[in-house]
Amino acid sequence: MDNPGMRPYALKAGEGWTYHAGIDFTVKAGELGRGRRLALIEYTTRRGEEPPDHTHPTEDEVFYVLQGALTFRCGEDTFEIDDGGFVFLPRGIPHGYTIRSDSDVRLLVVTAPAQEEAIGGWGGFVADIEAAGELRATPPGVG
C-alpha cells in the first residue's frame, strides 16, 4: 500500500469535521492525520465577514461558489463570480474577496501545496482552522 494508514471514506451532506472559528468551517478532506495533500472545506459566510487580503506562500487555492455572488481579487486581477462559478488563486499573490450578495454565501475551497517539497511541512488552511477553532462535530464512522 502506497499510503499506509490512509483509508477511503465518504461523507454525506452536512458531514465532516466542523470547526467554529468565527464561522463554521466543515472540513471534508485534509484534517489532521489524514495525509494533507489537499484540503476541501465547505463554509457559509455573509457580507461583513470577509477575510482581509492575504497571501499563501506555499499553497494554491481554488474557490467554487455554491451559492452567492462575490468579487475576488488576486494581485491586479478581479473576477465577478456567482452561483456555480470557479476561481483559481495561485500561491504568492495577495488575494481576497468581497461579498456582493445580500444573503448568505456558500463556498467550497480547495487548498493544495503548490510544490512537492512543501508537502512535508504543509499545514495550510485546515491547520489554521484546527488551531483557532473549536471542534464541534466529527463525521460518524470515520476514524
Region spans (language model):
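A generic "binding-loop/recognition-motif" signal
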Residues: 58, 77, 93-94, 103, ...
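A short, N-terminal "cap"/entry segment at the start of jelly-roll beta-barrel domains
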Residues: 1-38, 132-143
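Tight coil/turn sites that cap or link beta-strands
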Residues: 46-48, 84, 92, 102
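Conserved short histidine dyad/triad with adjacent acidic residue
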Residues: 24-27, 41-56
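Short acidic-glycine-tyrosine-enriched beta hairpin
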Residues: 12, 16, 33, 69, ...
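Short beta-strand segments in beta-sandwich/barrel cores
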Residues: 49-51, 63, 68-73, 86
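Short beta-strand His + acidic residue motifs that chelate non-heme Fe in jelly-roll/DSBH
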Residues: 53, 72-73, 89, 95-101, ...
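Double-stranded beta-helix
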Residues: 100-143
